[in-house]
Amino acid sequence: HNGVDLICESGLYIKSRTHGMVTKIGYPYDPADEKKGHLRYVEVSFDGNRFRYFYLDPMVQVGDKIVAGDVIGCSQDLTEIYTGITQHFHFEWIGPDGEFVDPTSMFDLL
């Protein structure tokens, strides 16, 4: 499990932690999957780094320039798919070398 899951309510506006450009809007699962195919992610890239925000309805398009703090989407409801799951979005940081970086340094965590 690369990245970090951050607890949130469904429908919460998710803001970019960095500036950059939207380089991908993708599906973490096969879009034909009746159960999970609607789940999406947004990738924001800056200086060779890629930041991925999973399980949100995108409010941006590929090519959009992003400033840190811009809303990029709304969190999707995972409880409809996984009974008993804690509602969350998933955040990943992939460094310029293609390796995953621990993203917790980007958040004020206690």
Which residues are covered by each model-predicted region?
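Short, small/polar residue-rich loop motifs at catalytic or cofactor-binding pockets
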Residues: 8-10
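Short acidic/polar mixed-charge low-complexity motifs
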Residues: 12, 49-50, 97-99
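Short proline/glycine- and basic residue-enriched helix-capping loop/turn segments at helix->loop/beta transitions
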Residues: 1
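Zn2+-dependent peptidoglycan hydrolase active-site motif and core
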Residues: 16-59, 81-90
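Short, well-structured beta-strand-loop connectors
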Residues: 13-25, 60-77
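Conserved, short, structured surface segments that act as functional micro-motifs
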Residues: 34-38, 64-110
